[in-house]
Amino acid sequence: MTNFEKIIAQNRIKTNAVLATYCVIFAFIGLLVDVIRINANDLGIALFKLMTFQIFPTITMIMFLVAFVVIVVCIQNFSSIMLSGDGYKLIDTSKVLSSKENQIHRLLLELLEEANLHFEPKLYIINAPYMNAFASGWNESNSLIALTSALIERLDRDELKAVIAHELSHIRHNDIRLTMCVGILSNIMLLVANFSVYFFMGNRKNSGANLARMILWVLQIILPFLTLLLQMYLSRTREYMADSGAAFLMHDNKPMIRALQKISNDYTNNDYKEIDKNSTRSAAYLFNAEMFSTHPSIKNRIQSLRKRVI
């Protein structure tokens, strides 16, 4: 097994772990609401009976159904969600392309040939004044890479190729699944927790139901921090891997370093917070300027790249 195959395998394990974690949290929230619903006197006994189906866990089953439906819907529509909010154009090779569009497509084909990859992501240009890029798609067959028009205009050929190589590495490592699962399911989970607290309380007097209510209140407070930590752990790891993947494909770490520096300087000199408010897409961007970003700092990414022996 090659180094990149190991990375892909590790990311698959992480993806499954993330999905399992969310399913467990969904189930736990559902079980707590079921305890309140049946007005249980003993929390432990009630949880055992619900988990062994001695009492049917109605709310828990609804939670699992919601989780399943959300995942399926997101798989089918994730690319359109990522592209929403801005004017974007597909680089369609069956039509006449501009010189810049031709250049981007040629760079992608070069990388695919050099890496011996047998799939071709769709290429999109997003009409935006900020410099950024992202990849999307559940797997290689429905993948895409999107670059902003500002990025295309301000980077040189090698820097553009390095950015495309970075996004291509995300696709190779199955990182997009992590972005999808963590970004969207985090929001759904928080909504479920809030919904449970405000709509399933009722006037319960038994101790088990009251304890379940207290746990739900605590979860409502800590879940935002838990999901943020989970996003940061997974996303920062995959950004380092994608940077290394770009350097590996380019046989040179300098173009990726220059691209990161230019993008970082662009965000330092301009305020783009009010322009792009797609939170799902921001988690997948090559660069994220927020203080509590899921991405590692540019300084740390450049230091990591400089340690990369080509």
Swiss-Prot record:
Membrane spanning residue stretches: 16-36, 55-75, 182-202, 214-234
Residue pairs linked by disulfide bridges in the UniProt entry: none
Co-factor: note: Binds 1 zinc ion per subunit.
Cofactor: Zn(2+)
Membrane topology, from the record: Multi-pass membrane protein
Alphabetical UniProt keywords: Cell inner membrane, Cell membrane, Hydrolase, Membrane, Metal-binding, Metalloprotease, Protease, Transmembrane, Transmembrane helix, Zinc
GO annotation (BP), single: proteolysis
Protein's name according to its UniProt entry: Protease HtpX homolog
